[in-house]
């Protein structure tokens, strides 16, 4: 299995912090966010590909130094205006690293409690299928900011709607995906058909019309870090786990 960790965005909502530091390298609980994500990914594979942009490729290269099995890919973009988009970045890595294996895709700015080993075990029981992690956010207003999924009793995903104005449920897709090796070439087909290259949930929505996709429900902590409030909340949650006092404002200092 290959893993692709998405870290090529420009995190404009976190400026000025992200003018000089990639969001995924900001410290959470005293460690770069990517450390926590990569620790999780290493539960299931040692073939890890991090895709980032030209602005921060050197920083990610230094971060990866000493981490066995981690390859950093520079997608060549330099600003939010010329970014490839998450799905474009997945295709970029597959072109460089090959597309002949099962694929785990995970966002580098998502922190969570569940075990990726459990996610993989769940997915392997479904045969030739892909899977997405799903979480009950518990609030219809909050659900408008995410992709809302409809899941059958057997866990098969029946529907997906990206950021609906009137969500039908509070069950949302989170940014962890497993693609069977037979489905991986469909990433290129999705893009070749002219579909949007951003928001990986759109790929799942498209895939539903072609192949079976299952939803893995999880509980516990989950942070999709996109703004200063979420960054501070995640930092304080991880600091508390380490026995450190909470902060009123976020700081990159330990």
Annotate each predicted stretch with a short phrase.
Residues 2-5, 13, 27, 31-107, ...:
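Conserved N-terminal catalytic core of the sugar/cofactor nucleotidyltransferase
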Residues 19-24:
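Short alpha-helical oligomerization interface
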Residues 25, 149-151, 215:
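A structural signal for short hydrophobic beta-strand segments in well-ordered beta-sheet cores
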Residues 77-82, 140, 166, 222-224:
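A short acidic, often aromatic-flanked loop/helix-cap motif at beta-alpha or helix-coil junctions
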Residues 84-91, 145-148, 230-233:
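Short, surface-exposed amphipathic charged segments that create phosphate/polyanion-binding patches used
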Residues 111, 120-124, 153-224, 228-253:
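Catalytic-core segments of class I nucleotidyltransferases/pyrophosphorylases
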Residues 114-143:
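Conserved donor-nucleotide/metal-binding helix-loop-beta segment in metal-dependent transferases, i.e.
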Residues 141-157:
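Conserved catalytic core of nucleotide-sugar-dependent glycosyltransferases
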